[in-house]
Structure formats: C-alpha cells, structure tokens
Regions:
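Acidic, low-complexity intrinsically disordered segments
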Residues: 2-211, 215-217
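Radical SAM [4Fe-4S] cluster-binding motif and immediate context
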Residues: 158-315, 320-322
Length: 322
C-alpha cells in the first residue's frame, strides 16, 4: 500500500469515526445521589459491551453510575453518536432519564437499551429507545452493523478492561452465563435462559486482557454449574494463571449444591479461593421448602461452619430474615 493511499485511508477513518458512550444505569437503594465505589461486585456489562466495537473506528467512553453516582455531565451526555444503556431491572426509569437528557443535547443520538429491564418489558421499552435488546451481549454486534455498518464491529469481542476505571485492585471475570437451577423466586427463571459455558481459551483471554490483579471476582451466576469436568478445568486454569502472576486470590458465587461434596472446598482453597458467596435465602427451613428453593442444603449453619473450617470465607444472601 502506497503512502498516499495510507494517508487517504487514515483520513477517511478519522472522518468516519463514531463516538459511543456506554452507561451502567443505577438507582441506589437509598434513592440518594451517592456513588458506591467500594461496593462489590461492580457492574461489568459496559466493559463487555465495549468489546463489540472496533477500536480503530470507534471512540468509546464508559460510565458506571453504581461506582460514580448519577451521570450529570452535560458535556458527556452531548458527546456520543450512540448511547448504550444497561443495568438491573430497577434501573429502567434511570434509562428513561438519560435518554431524555441525551436527546435534548443531540436529537440525532442513537439510543440502545438492553439487559434485565428491557427483557422484563420489551414491548413497552420500544416506545423510548431506538434499539431494544432482549438478547445477550453478542446482540450488540447486530445493532452496530445495522446502525453504523459491519466495519464498526470488532474482529474479536473481548472485554475492554482498559476502560473500566472503577475496578481498581479488583478484577472481574465471567466463565459461564446464567444458572442450571430454576428457583421460582429468581429473575433468571423468569427470563427463561439456560446455563452456558464459556470456552476455556476465551476465559484465558479475558484474564490476560484484564491484566494482573491482586483479587479477582468471578461474576458467574453459578460458578459451580452442572458440569464437573468444566468446573475442574477452570480450577486448573486458575492455578496456571496464578503461577503466571495474574491473580493472587479469588472469590465466586456458587449454589449450595457445591457444598454437598466436601472435597470441593479443598479444591477451591488449593486453587487460591479466598471466599464464596451463596444464597442461604432464609434460615426458615419451612419457607425454603414452600418456595421450592431447588439448591437448598440443610442445616444452613452447618454449611457455613463447613466453609469456614476449610479456610474459605462464607458470604451469604437472605431473601427473608426472620
């Protein structure tokens, strides 16, 4: 390729560059305008979505309202050609706010919304957003192709950890998607999605792209899953990456069936696991039985003690505290 041709190509790329702002929308549980930079885990959907865009043709900025508080920067809201919004179900109204603000600054801005809020009310959402995405993050590729053209889609979709200003000492990795259980009170059950495993090489690439971190949190809905071979393969991969210096300790979310095999605690501890989170849901056994919590293990206090005795910190959530 000649120098002149290269220059023309460079000028054309500069002229055709797009600007994309990806926001994790967040309503704090206190309903106050406060940042939660030390809350864990932090939202990572914007980081994964950013990986869908070509870094050669797209300037990307990320904003996490969970970590940084409500987005109120008028200059930032007027900047993008495309505004991509994601978040938890409770953030739907916040999506509406940001859409209205952005359109007052730029009437031509393309607004893309996805995640749990859109899957919960897909038809209603179409009144407000240009693109309503009910699928997984890969659907972003289709949106980019339709809105900008296929040249603006990344050759390989890897999370853009370099843009994740809020992660600090922590790294966040996803090795699987959704859950193999169907508890009636769970949002994943309502969405009707199935458990999906990631390719081990893709997991390795995520860790390398993340860079070296002291602590890593695996943000899988269920790190244990229903495939023991896959579980053991990931532990071996984690050991390899620890030896290479990419992480020192890690934590993950598992369902309580993980604790049925005593050896599991030894396996994760030997792989550098610092702590596990699981849904105790309630200390009322009758309530759990009535609500058909499929992964419940009794008695709950014994389960907690077993984890602590093995040297693994036990974190748990409650739906009902009595």
């Amino acid at each position: 390729m000649s120098y002149i041709t290269t220059s023309k190509l460079s000028r054309r790329r500069i002229r055709n560059r797009k600007r994309v702002l990806i926001v994790n929308c967040y309503f704090d549980y206190t309903r106050l305008s406060v940042p939660r930079p030390f809350k864990s885990p932090q939202a990572m959907a914007p980081v994964y979505l950013a990986g869908a865009f070509s870094d050669e043709l797209v300037d990307i900025r990320l904003y996490n309202e969970q970590s940084s508080g409500p987005l109120e920067d008028e200059n930032l809201l007027s900047w993008p050609d495309m505004l991509v919004l994601t978040g938890l179900t409770s953030a739907f109204d916040r999506m509406l706010h940001l859409t209205a603000y952005a359109r007052t600054k730029n009437t031509n801005v393309i607004v893309v919304a996805g995640g749990s809020p859109i899957r919960a009310i897909p038809n209603y959402s179409q009144r407000f957003f240009d693109y309503c995405c009910c699928g997984d993050i890969e659907q972003m590729n289709e949106v980019i192709t339709d809105a900008f053209g296929e040249d603006y889609v990344a050759r390989e979709m890897l999370p853009r950890y370099d843009l994740a200003y809020w992660t600090r000492r922590f790294g966040y990795i996803e090795t699987s998607r959704n859950c193999n259980f169907r508890c009636p009170f769970c949002a994943l059950t309502g969405e009707g999605v199935g458990y999906q495993k990631y390719d081990l090489e893709y997991i390795r690439k995520q860790i390398i792209a993340m860079g070296k971190k002291k602590y890593v949190i695996f943000i899988d809905n269920n790190f244990y899953g229903n495939d023991r071979k896959f579980f053991l393969e990931r532990l071996d991969l984690i050991k390899d990456m620890r030896k290479a210096g990419y992480l020192r300790s890690w934590a993950a979310l598992v369902t309580t069936d993980f604790f049925h095999k005593d050896e599991n605690l030894e396996l994760v501890r030997d792989a550098g696991c610092l702590g596990l989170f699981t849904g105790i849901e309630a200390f009322d056994t009758q309530w759990l039985q009535n609500n058909k919590a499929q992964n419940a293990h009794f008695p709950q206090v014994e389960l907690i003690s077993k984890s602590l005795d093995a040297g693994v910190v036990f974190h748990y959530g409650l739906i009902m505290d009595v």
